[in-house]
Design a protein with these regions (language model features):
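PLP-dependent amino-acid enzyme catalytic core
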Residues: 1-198
Length: 198
């Protein structure tokens, strides 16, 4: 496998997992709407899988945790665009900002005993086993992103002052007619429809 030393659990204001990693207490809560809507989960399903496979100490060895609010998301989109010329969507911007902060001094500050105010966005107070590699500039971060910034045009425009380009494939999809099939919220009706139409 790939020589991966660890991960950054970066999210938005729905920071249930970063809070758990930092405090050891898992507190599911109602989700809060943010610019990074795919992360708007107050009770993440992956928690149960992680808890079944690893102890909290094992998770803390492998994961740094980080969160941003909407203002931070806009700043991250803007900062990435200014520093690199790349336009990110809100979800990728959270990951980018997390890694940028971690490698630019947040991990060193944490290792030196300077703790971020836990109620403010940023790196939470947990030092993973790979923290020293970051401080020594011996770590490389890899960001994986799947969403196009064009799907979040208004948010991206607010951040960088211009609309993101729309990829040709997305333009093709946007030209397709809308197709919706009104249906009651009933599993059996849905199942019957699927069986009849597939």
């Amino acid at each position: 496998g790939a020589p991966i030393a660890g991960f950054v659990a970066a999210t938005n204001t729905n920071r249930t997992i970063p809070d758990w990693i930092a405090t050891g207490e898992y507190n599911a809560r109602p989700s809060v709407e943010t610019f990074a809507n795919a992360m708007d989960v107050g009770a993440p399903s992956n928690y149960e899988r992680i808890k079944a496979m690893y102890t909290l100490d094992q998770v803390r060895e492998q994961f740094a945790s980080y969160w941003l609010n909407n203002d931070g998301i806009l700043d991250a989109i803007r900062s990435c665009n200014t520093k690199t010329g790349y336009i990110m969507d809100p979800h990728g911007a959270i990951g980018w900002q997390a890694w940028d902060d971690i490698r630019s001094g947040a991990m060193k500050n944490l290792m030196d005993g300077v703790k971020n105010d836990f109620e403010k966005p940023g790196l939470t107070p947990n030092i993973p086993s790979w923290g020293q590699k970051v401080v020594e500039k011996k770590a490389v971060g890899v960001l994986l992103e799947t969403a196009s910034p064009a799907k979040f045009g208004e948010i991206v425009t607010d951040a960088i002052g211009k609309e993101p380009p729309i990829p040709a494939r997305l333009e093709e999809v946007m030209r397709l007619p809308d197709r919706a099939i009104p249906m009651e919220n009933d599993y059996n009706l849905f199942k019957d429809w699927l069986l009849a139409n597939l």
